[in-house]
Amino acid sequence: MSMTDNVADMLTRIRNAYKSKLINVSFPSSKIKTSILDVLQKEGYIKDYVTTQKNNISYTEVALKYSVNGEASICEIHRVSKPGKRVYSAIKDLKGYYNNMGIYILSTPYGVMSDREAHIKNVGGEVICKVF
């Protein structure tokens, strides 16, 4: 069975790892996944990530972030734009997710960025996912 949505697979692995209270999670690497992880790290949702090679296949290992109480830094992470139904949005149409406590991750002409950064640059794009 082939995988049609690699980004959704990554988000599901991260969500399941947080539910299982795992420290690390790994999955096959790609440029778009690395860009999304850059945004998650910049916004403080994950600790760090490392890309490694195993048998000529690159894998990304993500160090998940928990609070002092052991609560996950990500409560919800969902795919918005899917291969069968792409979702595009102008920046003026994106309201703050969970009263500005969460973020949207966008793919714009200037690269992958959070909705906060997109507001500063005044640019819209494809809404990849939402994180809270």
UniProtKB/Swiss-Prot annotation:
The keyword RNA-binding applies. One of its GO terms (molecular function) is rRNA binding. GO terms for cellular component: ribonucleoprotein complex; ribosome. GO terms for biological process: translation. Pfam families: Ribosomal_S8. Disulfide bonds: none annotated. InterPro entries: Ribosomal_uS8, Ribosomal_uS8_CS, Ribosomal_uS8_sf. Keywords: Ribonucleoprotein, Ribosomal protein, RNA-binding, rRNA-binding. PANTHER family: 40S RIBOSOMAL PROTEIN S15A (PTHR11758). One of the primary rRNA binding proteins, it binds directly to 16S rRNA central domain where it helps coordinate assembly of the platform of the 30S subunit. Belongs to the universal ribosomal protein uS8 family. Part of the 30S ribosomal subunit. Contacts proteins S5 and S12. This is Small ribosomal subunit protein uS8. The lineage of its organism: Bacteria, Pseudomonadati, Pseudomonadota, Alphaproteobacteria, Rickettsiales. The gene is rpsH.
